[in-house]
Amino acid sequence: MIQIYDEFFPRELQEEILNKLMEPHWHLRGGNDHNLFWHYDHLDQQEYFNEFLYKKICAKLDIKFSGISRIYANGQTACQGGTPHQDNDADMTFLYYPSLHWQPVMGGHLMFLDNDGFEDRIVQHKANRSVLFPGKLWHYASAPSRFYVGLRISLAYKLWL
């Protein structure tokens, strides 16, 4: 079951998260060899993300997870699309979009696929939105529009139930 939460964090916290994610720790190594995108690894080693923010996420979702598999961020610039994949390293995937402003025409939406590989559901990328879904679902992020000049960020938590 895919769950969507809008206006997930208060504006002040949203800005704080975005500022932390804009620190210069990005590497062009996400995705695969044929389809690279920006990646910010090892956020699970930062107390801000693995303690402070994790507790806020659990409280907001009203779920007690048994643990964290990984925390990282993906970043996409114009025309950088994701590759369809499953998150088999945890039961649930929590994504958070810390963007302060986003318009649907900018693209970068979260695409879920059916068993035949066709798009089954689209969750629009939206500022301060979060999405919780079973990691076994096939999904990918579509590319931001060629007119988008920023970094589309998704903060990812891989969680055990």
For each feature predicted by the language model, list its residue ranges.
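Non-heme Fe(II)/2-oxoglutarate
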Residues: 1-69, 76
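Catalytic core of non-heme Fe(II) oxygenases with the double-stranded beta-helix
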Residues: 51, 55-161
